Amino acid sequence: MKQVVIASRESPLAMWQAEHIRARLQALYPGLEVSILGITTQGDRILDKTLNKIGGKGLFVKELELAMQEGQADLAVHSIKDVPMDLPEGFALAAICEREDPRDAFVSSRYASLSELPAGAVVGTASLRRESQIRARYPHLLVKPLRGNLQTRLRKLDEGQYDAIILAASGLKRMGLAERIRMELSTADSLPAVGQGALGIEIRADRTDLMALLAPLNHPATYACVTAERAMGRALGASCQIPVGGYAEQHEHMLVMRGFVATPDGTTLLHAEATAPAEYADALGRTIAKKLLDQGADDVIDAVKAAG
């Protein structure tokens, strides 16, 4: 194989991620020509509505999959948290790279933490998962939708439209903006999204040549953790329309995982935790989902969908 084309969203963060994978591939295979095909996805174009109102995170990946299907690109680089739990038939995740910081970050010009915000302060987030956890812990705060790429969200904060915003720490760090983080929220305070902080490389399932080429980029511990998280999400029928979080960590050969399902207003928050050997990652995720369903998660999910 002499050349590879990477499909990527055109936001600065997405292009950084694609450039990162390009650099890693060229370091591994010095003779390989790697180019990037930038694509503006539907999710990037529709910015006046929240994702749960316009079809969810699949809007960020469909055009990239089409480019692979039509032979314009060989692979696509995604933030795993933006990838639907079920890939379309004919596609596969060839590699999941080592995870960056999975935590949520508190960003504000005036305040050092969520606990410092006064009653009625406006917090911006694009995520129902973040909203539900903030409203459960800080019911006196006002949570408002926040769309746009990373730079747009920071600009809206700086213009005074919000008192604080919550973003993925990994994105800020990858873009060299770690100094904007006032506080990283612990995973106990804000359980991350499924796959948060990890990059995934998607290919057509019939491209066995690419599967071998990309194998060195796969990080086994991250792959196991994300496999467990996505198995939980799949079993719950999770999407960005439902406040769901899942986070697994590997300690030696064991995975420790926590998951939650909530209502957006934070009045109902169901938690579950379990442990399993890393080779049973998929089963661990399904165990977490079952524990949540046994607590009534299906009723919560149905109620959120009906209200949606």
From Swiss-Prot:
Stored Gene3D superfamilies: Periplasmic binding protein-like II (3.40.190.10), Porphobilinogen deaminase, C-terminal domain (3.30.160.40)
InterPro entries, per database record: HemC, Porphobilin_deaminase_cofac_BS, Porphobilin_deaminase_N, Porphobilinogen_deaminase_C, Porphobilinogen_deaminase_C_sf
Pfam family membership, one: Porphobil_deamC
GO process terms (BP): protoporphyrinogen IX biosynthetic process
Residues modified as S-(dipyrrolylmethanemethyl)cysteine: C240
Signal peptide: none
Matches recorded under PROSITE patterns: PORPHOBILINOGEN_DEAM
Pathway: Porphyrin-containing compound metabolism; protoporphyrin-IX biosynthesis; coproporphyrinogen-III from 5-aminolevulinate: step 2/4
Entry's cofactor comment: Binds 1 dipyrromethane group covalently.
An MF annotation (GO) of this entry: hydroxymethylbilane synthase activity
Catalysed reactions listed for this entry: 4 porphobilinogen + H2O = hydroxymethylbilane + 4 NH4(+)
Xref: SUPFAM superfamilies: Periplasmic binding protein-like II (SSF53850), Porphobilinogen deaminase (hydroxymethylbilane synthase), C-terminal domain (SSF54782)
Domain of life where this protein originates: Bacteria
Keywords of the record: Porphyrin biosynthesis, Transferase
CDD domains named in the record: PBP2_EcHMBS_like
Subunit structure: Monomer.
Record's miscellaneous remark: The porphobilinogen subunits are added to the dipyrromethane group.
Similarity section: Belongs to the HMBS family.
Record's function text: Tetrapolymerization of the monopyrrole PBG into the hydroxymethylbilane pre-uroporphyrinogen in several discrete steps.
PANTHER family: PORPHOBILINOGEN DEAMINASE
Protein name: Porphobilinogen deaminase
Species assigned in the record: Laribacter hongkongensis (strain HLHK9)
Lineage, opening ranks: Bacteria, Pseudomonadati, Pseudomonadota, Betaproteobacteria, Neisseriales
Gene name tied to this protein: hemC
